[in-house]
């Protein structure tokens, strides 16, 4: 579990410039130095350890925790640590409705599965070069936006977010659906929007990596407890039909842009 030394070495205590702050974060601020707010690491440590246990217990109950972080400093760590603990993630861009309109998102994921099946069974080779190219392009777009959540069959039970200001749409959707939000809170964030806050820097790469690493460790610890109880996850695959293949091909050939569709 995280230590005070870890927090200091990763710069978790450095907040934003004093002119960029949310007054609701005042209770988490230790002081100010050279125009930068310094976060109270005693409180960070306490909240961190409490939240670690919350996340561990959620994983032990078999719950799905969605990792979200699309900015440059977060994308790599979000993907790396979500994969290390076998959880879904969004690190490219949050598409509006990813949780509130999850049925439509699942339909798009199904299209990805159809294209991959066509590649696997060789039916894509029966198409013209242009048709095959359009399907490949559609697959690349679907993978970029939805690859991290392709195995998420239902809405998540909890989300872990890096930068709640940038990911405000994801946080709003979670709040609307009453899905608990876990997140580091920098001095410009609104703590009222987060169920389990951890006051800390959400911009520095090392700080972001520490948060992601600790959440992954908590999840793996919880999963290990679940395995001891003999719980197992069964993943059922639905057979892909020729009709589905034709529908996806027709859509790809119409040159519909997935990213623009979901704005």
Swiss-Prot record:
Residues 250-263 have a biased composition (Acidic residues). Keywords: Ribonucleoprotein, Ribosomal protein. Gene3D superfamilies: Glucose-6-phosphate isomerase like protein, domain 1, Helix hairpin bin. Pfam families: Ribosomal_S2. GO terms for cellular component: cytosolic small ribosomal subunit. GO terms for biological process: translation. Residues 230-263 are annotated as: Disordered. Residues 230-249 have a biased composition (Basic and acidic residues). GO terms for molecular function: structural constituent of ribosome. Belongs to the universal ribosomal protein uS2 family. PANTHER family: 30S RIBOSOMAL PROTEIN S2 PROKARYOTIC AND ORGANELLAR (PTHR12534), SMALL RIBOSOMAL SUBUNIT PROTEIN US2M (PTHR12534:SF0). HAMAP family: Ribosomal_uS2_B. This is Small ribosomal subunit protein uS2. It comes from Campylobacter jejuni subsp. jejuni serotype O:2 (strain ATCC 700819 / NCTC 11168). The gene is rpsB.
